[in-house]
Amino acid sequence: MVTLYCVVVGVAGSAFPVDIDENKSVGHLKDAIKEKNASTITCDAKNLQLFLAKKKKGAGVRLTENDVKDGVSDTSDLKLLGVAGAPLSLVGLSEKDVKFVPTLEDVESMNTPVHVLVVVPEQDGTISKEMSAATSPLTVEQVEMSMNKVLRERDEKASAYSFSDLNTAMEERIVKKMRLTENIPDVKEPVDTSIAGYSWIPKIVESEESQRAGYMEYLQQHLKTLIDRGDFLLDDIAGDKSVLNIVDPRLPFAMKGTADVLLINRTAKNPLIKLAGVSLVIELKKKVEPGHVPQAIGQLVSCSMKAPLNCYPLSLLTDLNDHWHFSWFSDKHVLTQVTLKYPKNAFRFIEAAVLGRTDSAPPPPSFMPGSFKTIKVDDFLPQPVDARAEEMMERYELMADVVEPEFLMARRMDYARQLVQSMPMYSYMYT
């Protein structure tokens, strides 16, 4: 939603605000302006002419309330918003374009911006000669080009959050978008101090090379049973800053970044596909805190969505001492999280988890309640057949009053055909 301050040309007085979605069109803005001034604007909304309140045809400085307080009549240096179907985000009226945080000085000097000048036709429906530029309807090609440009620019500008920046509110957005239920089972973990924790090198960050070499050696040593089988290996990915980058319509926002280590099934490893064979994604912290959990959840979600078939990864957030926080999808729309205290129990859990789908799967540790199962996101939340087509259709519907009815009906039929074709029971009709 964007707030646009508008002024009627030839009328002295204060600017008035109009709240509107930046993805709405110029035609929608005309409707909103007329509705806001129903008693003073009596013509049809389509007969209004709108100008971008920036000099030099939209390339110069924006007009302020001080500039127009006594009325304005000359629009020759302003850009006409003459295409009714043009999205506001494409004509200089996006939230980013109009963002302005006024100071007290701005308010006192009336240096607050005006965004749109409105020309109301005279009673006989005419508009002065200098304001008579024609407004032509959009062609099918123009509508599709405009929509594609909006979507492309939206994707390019979409916020991509680093995993390390994820917080509890963002985790809640992921959970809500994916319709997840969180399961925190009661674990009666036995005391087992047979494996000591890792001694971090003081005053050196986790990602520094010598620190990485140290914790990789520790993990290699205590996952020796798995690695000696010949079908598992540890992969240090801390230096690959984009391996978990993801943009997916099933998520509320894009995410970017990496983790520290992957445990990979060697038989499926592919040098060209980084996540081939991934069984466990590990994030290491010198000190694990509650605020780190959203990062681990984001890494699990990304890894699960990006991993090839037959990969069912878990996530581990750990300090390699007394915090071993595991996350995985245990059933449809169920996100299970377990925190263990002792390294020995954690390594036993890892072994049972990653071997769970093999013929030599050991029984799950006795302290784990119930049966152990892992699935991936695609098993309960498949990728939309054509998310872009769905979004495009939504935008066409919003522009129903400015596109030809025949064009809109054709797009509806195309979209419906795509939906039917995606249904397995009807797919044979289209092969």
UniProtKB/Swiss-Prot annotation:
Glycosylation sites: 23, 37, 265
Induction, as annotated: Expressed during colonization of tomato leaves by P.infestans.
UniProt motif (HVLVXXP motif) ranges: 114-121
Signal sequence coordinates: 1-17
Keyword Secreted carried by entry: yes
Pfam families the record matches: Crinkler (PF20147)
Compartments reported by the entry: Secreted; Host cell
InterPro entries attached to this UniProt entry: Crinkler_N
Location of the region described as LQLFLAK domain in the Swiss-Prot/TrEMBL record: 18-54
Span list, region DWL domain: 55-113
One Gene Ontology cellular component: extracellular region
Keywords (A to Z) from UniProt: Glycoprotein, Secreted, Signal, Virulence
Known function: Secreted effector that elicits necrosis in host plants, a characteristic of plant innate immunity.
Family: Belongs to the Crinkler effector family.
UniProt note: domains: The CRN proteins have modular architectures that include a signal peptide, a conserved N-terminus, and highly diverse C-terminal domains. The conserved CRN N-terminus harbors a distinct LXLFLAK motif, which is followed by the conserved DWL domain. A highly conserved HVLVXXP motif marks the end of the CRN N-terminal domains and forms a junction where diverse C-terminal domains are fused. The conserved CRN N-terminus mediates the translocation into the plant host cells.
Protein name from the UniProt record: Crinkler effector protein 1
Organism of derivation: Phytophthora infestans (Potato late blight agent)
Gene assigned in the entry: CRN1
